[in-house]
Design a protein with these regions (language model features):
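Short acidic, glycine/serine/threonine-rich loops at helix termini
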Residues: 84-88, 133-139, 227-231
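Active-site rim/loop-helix segments in enzyme catalytic domains that contact anionic ligands
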Residues: 63, 73-112
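Conserved nucleotide- and phosphate/pyrophosphate-binding catalytic cores
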Residues: 205-402
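Short, hydrophobic/aliphatic alpha-helical segments
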Residues: 35-44, 72, 173-183, 224, ...
């Protein structure tokens, strides 16, 4: 293992909170002195299995722990997903079925290994121990915390003061997540800043059991492509880690300039020293923001698709956005071609170029719809084989007769 001081320097870079910091330093020092790896836990609730860059913020930090020789456990909350994490929710969430949980968990595992080393990752499911608790065990667990303390949590407090219902089983979620830390004997637990209450619950319950208490590391919430709200698939401001290289590159080029260095810090493998130098170059004018953003986009694509794909994504971006040419690889959309006009909003929606007919109409009205590179404001057109339809700057399909 490298020195505890160097591990701390690299691990603490870019984190939101490290609680308590002195304890974490001592854990690292002991791990190095005894050559005993720390047990580092990340719990995942498999309710939305498609991972985007926002999720990789914590995964990249976990990869650092793996590189230092520590033991990383990804805990799939298959049992707790049947309750649904109430964190940040204004209403009670419906539970998932067992089949949904299994399907989502499988997808999670496939995607997290795009960041983590599968040979150094232990995947566990909390049904291993939670399903074995009897009612007496549950009551004992419930006795470890008070309703008053539960209501200190922001989302519970807000719902309570507004008179909105909170189900008893929702109080059990943080307790069960905390119990996971007892079962795994976690030394460190990771999460987002919105999970601090639940993470501290694990520390509290470990102390109640007379165990060494875990330290907490929370990572910042990554802003999405709009630069304002957190990255979210539902908000459409995300970069999915399984997206095509050209799509991923194009999206990365839309990141606001002021967030470029934050993205380098949170979602890439660029060293701290390189980040500091690049930041200085931007401030001094030695580096142009466009070139830095292209470097960021190339780095992101390389991490998930490799160097060759990153080069392709960059070439496509230059071709389409700087030279205003058509992409070389346009997805085909098969449709029956007749002499009858088709309703364009429905076609665009069905083809996935827009999310709805309404969005399609707005795109047409705004001049964002093109046919073979030419703007079109018609809502009814006659299709032709090989015709290329475009919405916005990045969405294309080629019409193919079926």
């Amino acid at each position: 293992m490298i020195s505890a001081a160097e591990q701390f320097r690299l691990i603490s870079h870019g984190v939101a909170d490290l609680l308590p910091e002195d304890e974490f330093k001592k854990k690292l020092e002991k791990a190095v002195a005894t050559n005993t790896p720390l047990i580092v836990k990340l719990g995942l609730d498999p309710t939305a299995p498609d991972i985007h860059l926002g999720h990789t913020v914590v995964l990249r930090k976990l990869k650092l722990f793996q590189d230092f020789g520590h033991k990383v456990i990804i805990l799939i909350g298959d049992f707790t997903a049947r309750i649904g994490d109430p964190t940040g929710k204004s209403v009670t969430r419906p539970p998932l079925t067992e089949e949904q949980v299994i399907t989502n968990a499988k997808t999670y595992q496939e995607q997290i290994f795009k960041v983590l080393d599968p040979e150094k990752t232990e995947v566990r499911f909390n049904s291993e121990w939670l399903s074995k608790l009897d009612f007496a065990d549950v009551l004992k667990l419930a006795s470890k915390y008070t309703v008053a303390r539960m209501l200190e949590r922001d989302d519970f407090h807000k719902r309570y003061t507004e008179g909105r219902p909170i189900s008893i089983h929702e109080f059990m979620y943080p307790l069960m997540q905390g119990y996971d830390s007892i079962a795994l004997k976690a030394d460190v637990e990771f999460g987002g800043t919105d999970q601090t209450f639940n993470l501290l619950m694990g520390r509290h319950l470990q102390g109640e059991e007379g165990m060494p208490e875990q330290t907490i590391i929370t990572m910042p919430i990554l802003e999405g492509l709009d630069g304002v709200q957190k990255m979210s698939k539902s908000l459409g401001n995300y970069i999915g880690i399984s997206e095509a290289p050209s799509e991923m590159y194009g999206k990365a080029m839309s990141i606001p300039d002021e967030l470029m260095m934050r993205y380098f810090m949170l979602v890439t493998d660029m060293s701290i020293e390189e980040q500091e130098q690049l930041s200085k170059d931007l401030e001094s004018g030695a580096a142009h923001p466009r070139d830095v953003k292209m470097k960021l986009a190339h780095t992101i694509v390389r991490l998930y698709h490799g160097e060759e794909a990153a080069n392709f994504g960059q070439d496509e971006f230059v071709r389409v956005f700087q030279k205003h040419a058509m992409p070389t690889d346009i997805p085909e959309y098969k449709v029956a071609i007749t002499e009858e006009p088709v309703f364009v909003p429905q076609l665009l929606s069905d083809a996935g170029l827009t999310a709805s007919n309404g969005e399609a109409r707005r795109s047409i009205k705004a001049g964002a719809f093109k046919i073979d590179g030419e703007k079109c404001n018609e809502e009814h057109i006659v299709l032709k084989d090989g015709m290329v339809l475009q919405v916005g700057k990045r969405k294309f399909i080629k019409i193919v007769s079926c």
